[in-house]
Regions:
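Conserved active-site alpha-helix within GNAT-family acetyltransferase domains
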Residues: 113-114, 121, 136-153
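A short beta-loop-alpha structural element at the N-terminal edge
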Residues: 19-34
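Conserved GNAT acetyl-CoA-binding A-motif
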Residues: 122-133
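Conserved beta-strand in the GNAT
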Residues: 73, 80-89, 96-101
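Conserved acetyl-CoA pyrophosphate-binding loop and the N-cap/start of the following alpha-helix
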Residues: 106, 110-118
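A short, internal acetyl-CoA/4′-phosphopantetheine-binding micro-motif in the GNAT/acyltransferase core
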Residues: 100-107, 133-135
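Conserved GNAT-fold acetyl-CoA-binding loop/helix
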Residues: 34-62
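A short helix-loop-beta-strand connector motif used in the catalytic cores of GNAT acetyltransferases and
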Residues: 61-73
Length: 167
């Protein structure tokens, strides 16, 4: 009976946590872009580099990403969008994952991991998942490693040392 109780509690917790993740709608994009800029500003300040592409992205560009892929949002219990991730599949069945963001006040609570799990689940026909992150973001590198991504190579992109990872 105790085992069933433990199983049931874990199962219910998993259902509850995933109700926070859903596909973004077009009217969410303004809030997601704002969250993106807030999240990447922390990185920009650490690097003293304020022209990072995620900080410069505009509404038209995020709308294009919305049209060509999937954008997920993580909604807190009080209805605020506090996390997001994007994915799109190319013609070679590679899923390109990008812009995993979590509001600074909500980091280190498992939200990034949940978003990664869910975006991968939504692309069952992909044989490879690919992403890149800045070398100066060790916490992000650690998260991606924990969820199964391996470093493929390093390259300079727009003056930033980037790490390409795949799963």
């Amino acid at each position: 009976a105790m085992l069933l109780l433990v199983f049931r509690k874990v199962y219910i917790c998993n259902i509850m946590s995933h109700t926070n993740i859903m596909q973004a709608e077009e009217n969410d994009l303004v809030n997601i872009l704002s969250l993106q800029k807030k999240s990447f500003m922390v990185v920009a300040e650490r690097m003293n580099k304020f022209d990072l592409p995620p900080l410069l992205q505009n509404q038209d560009e995020i709308c294009d990403e919305y049209q060509t892929g999937i954008i997920l949002k993580y909604v807190s219990d009080d209805g605020q969008i506090v996390g997001s991730v994007r994915g799109r599949m190319d013609e070679n069945r590679v899923c390109h994952i990008g812009k995993l963001i979590v509001h600074p006040d909500f980091q280190n609570k498992g939200i990034g991991r949940e978003l990664m799990t869910e975006i991968e689940r939504l692309f069952p026909h992909c044989h490879t998942f690919s992403l890149f992150t800045g070398e100066e973001t060790p916490n992000t590198l650690h998260l991606y490693s924990k969820v199964g991504y391996n470093i493929v190579c390093r390259k300079e992109m727009e003056g930033i040392s980037m790490i390409i990872m795949e799963k």
